[in-house]
Curated annotation (Swiss-Prot):
Substrates-to-products reaction catalysed: RNA(n+1) + phosphate = RNA(n) + a ribonucleoside 5'-diphosphate
Cofactor field: Mg(2+)
EC numbers on record: 2.7.7.8
Organism lineage string: Bacteria, Pseudomonadati, Pseudomonadota, Betaproteobacteria, Burkholderiales
Organism: Polynucleobacter asymbioticus (strain DSM 18221 / CIP 109841 / QLW-P1DMWA-1) (Polynucleobacter necessarius subsp. asymbioticus)
UniProt name for this protein: Polyribonucleotide nucleotidyltransferase
Sequence ranges assigned to domain S1 motif in this UniProt record: 623-691
Keywords: Cytoplasm, Magnesium, Metal-binding, Nucleotidyltransferase, RNA-binding, Transferase
Name of the gene encoding the protein in the UniProt record: pnp
Biological processes, Gene Ontology terms: mRNA catabolic process; RNA processing
């Protein structure tokens, strides 16, 4: 007799066998589900407080996705040998899970909810993000917490004209698309993707395909709920105080309508704050007022005003129609000593973007569960509080900044040159200096221009545009290049980035159900129109990549040596390569296949380092004349160094055409002579001749007191061969 009441559901999902179970582990949580997809095992748990905190004004949902190194059979690095702060990858997956879950909690539900997902076992070929999202959704579904789920999710690839369901990492390597879609049985809620310049039709088809395929997971979750679900919470939203709403509306609606005729963001924000203060003051004359309730009512009035204006065909907040992109200004090369820079301004959104070139040593080393790998392209997004005219914390990046940076990176990856064509590592940093919507897409545009300014041979210009949607029954309006307020008050925000040939990144967040395939089709077509307009502005500002790198960027040269020679270049304990680096001022990297990359801002230093490495690794050629010092005198000849680490024997009989009695009569240690390589045996022993070199080049050698002097009639310049 077991103490556990387990419920297990198994199903085939594409090429994967999936198992969901609950009732054995984490029984004190509100809900816990373990999902196993071909040995990638994750545990999703949820706990919610039974009541909201007094004065709570927002829904406090937190989602934490945590990877445990034991899942991959590893012990963590570092002094403490335990997991530390979440990695960038963990943060991104936490956001990925949060986005489709958040809209499904009912309005007015302000209880704290915490979703925690642990990765317990990892199959390196099966990514853990989709299992994690399924586990979180299932845990919420069985918990009884008010939640309009369950949510399903699917990864979609695209290869050879066919969509792939939940491709493995091996399959992803040849896929032109990496798209994750999440939603309910009825509607899509979230899309995140990276694509290789695919058409709008292919992208929309992938979204629809993914939504169809996720129904298998949703049905399995519903079956699990039927068998093991907890009773639904007895929760209802607090009834609305209609008389109070009417009172606030009477005070605020007219001045708010007036405020939304102000086109400039700063002036409009000041006016809205002023109206809020005035309304609060008038209400407080009649007694105590719940500030949270008043702010909620004011938000609803603002949403009604803005949405109705747009749906009625009136101008938007800043005076534009639904299809117009804000004015764009672009300036390249704005910073004198950076490798590449661009200032991209679109209306009241501005990004100062800087590109920096580095060597292989500058690549980011990522120690992921599935194994360590290196990333040669980094994109970092920063938005300080002054960008919106506010004060606030400045420090390490927040989740939003990490997410925006990854979106911009996804948009630019498809146009980057290969490492073979451009050996540099690249870091792009977007500093948002002004923000009124669409700052991540401004970062895409600025990032592309900054790389072009740095001389990175990108395959095409990439532009991004943020779109919005207002939906009311059968009426809808798609908005191009949305403002911050339009994002806040709208029903969908989606960002599309790409080239003139197709989409490279698509991110979509939908706050309501009822958005159809036809609406998404209209939205994507309008986004393409906006993207092409922005691309034309970018091409006007910078038509092609700079042909010359910045004077402050490192120059690089790559060449091959025989892998067997690597240890000679490195030297004992790294002594040789360290000396080379110090003496030439160059950065030198050697790969296991013998590829040597030298980087330096000095052309002379780079040339010297290359020559010295070639000297160290050079093979002696029979018949070639070399110049080198006499390193040791012997009774029967002398040892002469002709290449780094390579000494040859100059026999006494090969010193002169005349009979030589004593070697020291003709040669001295340290004396530089020119000798011809006569032969090299299998053991690498070299036989040299001074008289043969003299015969080829002209000249004589005569005995001197203490040392010999070479008399060359027209001795060739040092380093030349016959």
């Amino acid at each position: 007799m077991t103490m556990f009441k387990k419920a297990v559901k198994s199903f085939q999902w594409g090429n994967h066998q999936v198992t969901m179970e609950t009732g054995e582990i984490a029984r004190q949580s509100g809900g816990a589900v373990i999902v196993n997809v071909d040995d990638t095992v994750v545990m999703g748990t949820v706990v919610a407080s039974k009541s909201a905190k007094p004065g709570q004004s927002f829904f406090p949902l937190t989602v934490d996705y945590l990877e445990k190194t034991y899942a991959a059979g590893k012990i963590p690095g570092g002094f403490f040998r335990r997991e530390g702060r979440p990695s960038e990858g963990e943060t991104l997956i936490s956001r990925l899970i949060d986005r489709p879950l958040r809209p499904l909690f009912p309005e007015g539900f302000l209880n704290e909810v915490q979703v925690v997902i642990h990765v317990l076992s990892i199959n390196p070929d099966v990514p853990s993000d989709i299992p994690a999202l399924i586990a979180a959704s299932a845990a919420l579904a069985i918990s009884g917490i008010p939640f309009a789920g369950p949510v399903g999710a699917a990864r979609v690839g695209y290869a050879n004209g066919q969509y792939l369901l939940n491709p493995t990492r091996t399959e992803q390597a040849t896929s032109e698309l990496d798209l994750i879609v999440a939603g309910t049985q009825a509607a899509v809620l979230m899309v995140e993707s990276e694509a290789n310049q695919l058409s709008e039709e292919v992208m929309l088809g992938a979204v629809v395909y993914g939504h169809d395929q996720m129904q298998t997971a949703i049905n399995a979750i519903n079956e699990l709920v039927a068998e093991a679900g907890k009773p639904e919470w007895d929760w209802t939203a607090a009834p609305k105080d209609e008389p109070f709403i009417a009172k606030v509306t009477a005070l605020a609606e007219a001045p708010l309508r007036e405020a939304y005729q102000i086109r400039q963001k700063g002036a409009r924000s000041d006016k809205l704050k002023e109206i809020t203060k005035e309304v609060m003051a008038k209400l407080q004359e009649e007694g105590d007022v719940d500030a949270v309730a008043v702010n909620d009512i004011l938000f609803e009035i603002e949403a009604k005003i803005v949405r109705s204006q747009i749906l009625n065909g009136e101008p938007r907040i800043d005076g534009r129609d639904t299809r117009t992109v804000r004015p764009i200004e672009i300036r390249n090369g704005v910073l004198p000593r950076t490798h590449g820079s661009a200032l991209f301004t679109r209306g009241e959104t501005q990004a100062l973007v800087v590109a920096t070139l580095g060597t292989a040593r500058d690549e980011q080393i990522i120690d992921a569960l599935e194994g360590e790998y290196r990333d040669r392209f980094m994109f970092h997004y920063n938005m300080p509080p002054f960008a919106t005219g506010e004060t606030g914390r400045v420090g390490s990046p927040k989740r939003r900044e990490i997410g925006h940076g990854r979106l911009a990176k996804r948009a630019l990856i498809p146009v980057l040159p290969s490492a073979e064509d451009f050996a540099y590592s690249i870091r792009v940093v977007s500093e948002i200096t002004e923000s009124n919507g669409s700052s991540s897409m401004a970062s895409v545009c600025g990032g592309c221009l900054a790389m072009m300014d740095a001389g990175v041979p990108v395959k095409a210009h990439v532009a991004g545009v943020a779109m919005g949607l207002i939906l009311d029954g059968n009426r809808f309006a798609v908005l191009t290049d949305i403002l911050g307020d339009e994002d806040h008050l709208g029903d969908m925000d989606f960002k599309v980035a790409g080239t003139a040939n197709g989409i490279t990144a698509l991110q979509m967040d939908i706050k309501v159900q009822g958005i159809t395939k036809e609406i998404m089709q209209v939205a994507l077509a309008q986004a393409k129109e906006g993207r092409l307009h922005i691309l034309s502005k970018m091409q006007e500002a910078m038509g092609s990549v700079r042909t010359e790198l910045s004077a402050h960027a490192p120059r690089m040269v790559s060449f091959k040596i025989h892998p067997d020679k690597i240890r000679e270049v490195i030297g004992k304990g790294g002594a040789t390569i360290q000396a080379l680096t110090k003496e030439t001022g160059c950065s030198i990297d050697i790969k296991d296949d013998g590829t040597v990359t030298i980087a330096s801002t000095s052309a002379e230093g780079m040339a010297e380092a290359k020559a010295r490495i070639e000297g160290i690794t050079a093979e002696a050629e029979v018949g070639k004349i070399y110049e080198g010092p006499v390193v040791k005198l012997l009774e029967f000849g002398a040892l002469v160094n002709i290449l780094p680490g390579k000494d040859g024997l100059l026999h006494i009989s090969e010193i002169s055409n005349e009979r030589v009695k004593e070697v020291k009569d003709y040669l001295a240690e340290g004396q530089v002579v020119r000798v011809k390589l006569l032969a090299a045996d299998e053991r690498g022993r070299l036989r040299l001749s001074l008289k043969a070199a003299m015969a080829d080049e002209g000249g004589t050698i005569a005995p001197l007191a203490g040392a010999a002097e070479v008399v060359a009639e027209e001795a060739p310049a040092s380093g030349e061969s016959a």
